[in-house]
Amino acid sequence: MEDFHHISVLPDEVLQALSPKSGGVYVDGTLGGAGHAGLILTASAPEGRLIGFDRDEEAIAVARQRLSVFGGRVRIIHRNFAGIAQALAEIGVDGIDGFVLDLGVSSHQLDRDERGFSFMHDAPLDMRMDRSSGQSAADLVNTLPEAELYRIISEYGEERWAKRVASFIVKARDERPIETTLELVDVIKGAIPKAKWEERLHPATRTFQALRIAVNEELKSLEEGLQGLLSLLKQGGRGAVISFHSLEDRIVKEGFRAAATGCTCPKELPICVCGRVPRFKLVTRKPITAGESEVAANPRSRSAKLRVVEKI
């Protein structure tokens, strides 16, 4: 696992947002290479605790090694953060002082050919974050009805050529199963007219994103995990979420906004009858993005958006 690498995005901004303190309990729901976790544990010394979650077994192994210096202050759990509230209840945690979610696919996952996330190298068409369970991208590509493939590619990839891509996939798999990343890339390139390829975007980008989201149920996990984490925040506790595409950011933005919304009664009513009071306040009205120096050092940070909320 020594070659596992992942540069945490917006590290200073996350640390400033959470302002970890000794004695606090913090959650990293997307542990990855443990970059954010290490910073939080260091800042919350000597008594701050962190519970880290990840569904990638390789990431878990690396995080255990990298965070071993913090001893009993850290606990690592191999689990998708969608079920985070239940997982924390099982270990007796009923309140937290802060959480971070970094929703990006790690550099390690993208760069390891055998994981099947990248359209730049040939590999088995997998894309599972947790390779011990669930259907792979190849399973979806070779078994889903054309209409469902179209829905996934259109909705999750926001691909304008989704209908043609889905049609071409079905035609290709009728001849033989699509089993590798580059086999799928060839199908996509055939479906999208070359004259319509975007200058700075590989033609397979949106379809690969869509399949990755579908394989890992990323949006559903985000909705469930976010609500669970918000429900556990103590007064004054903060949540920080880093998203990388518009679908994720929309869920985070709307989730935070709903939590920070008070009375929803029609304006014509003289008094409030709904009884709704805001439970949170938005720390960031607009998302925080990476500066020029960080983007230069880590190009993947270019699309990162950080939103922060506080329990009141």
UniProtKB/Swiss-Prot annotation:
Keywords per UniProt: Cytoplasm, Methyltransferase, rRNA processing, S-adenosyl-L-methionine, Transferase
Domain of life assignment: Bacteria
Official protein name in the record: Ribosomal RNA small subunit methyltransferase H
EC class name: transferase
Residues that bind S-adenosyl-L-methionine: A34, G35, H36, D54, F81, D102, Q109
GO CC, alphabetical: cytoplasm
Keyword rRNA processing: yes
Catalytic reaction annotation: cytidine(1402) in 16S rRNA + S-adenosyl-L-methionine = N(4)-methylcytidine(1402) in 16S rRNA + S-adenosyl-L-homocysteine + H(+)
GO molecular function, one term: rRNA (cytosine-N4-)-methyltransferase activity
Pfam families: Methyltransf_5
Record keyword Cytoplasm present: yes
Entry-linked InterPro entries: RsmH, SAM-dep_MeTrfase_MraW_recog, SAM-dependent_MTases_sf
Function: Specifically methylates the N4 position of cytidine in position 1402 (C1402) of 16S rRNA.
Annotated family: Belongs to the methyltransferase superfamily. RsmH family.
GO biological process: rRNA base methylation
Localization, UniProt: Cytoplasm
EC number: 2.1.1.199
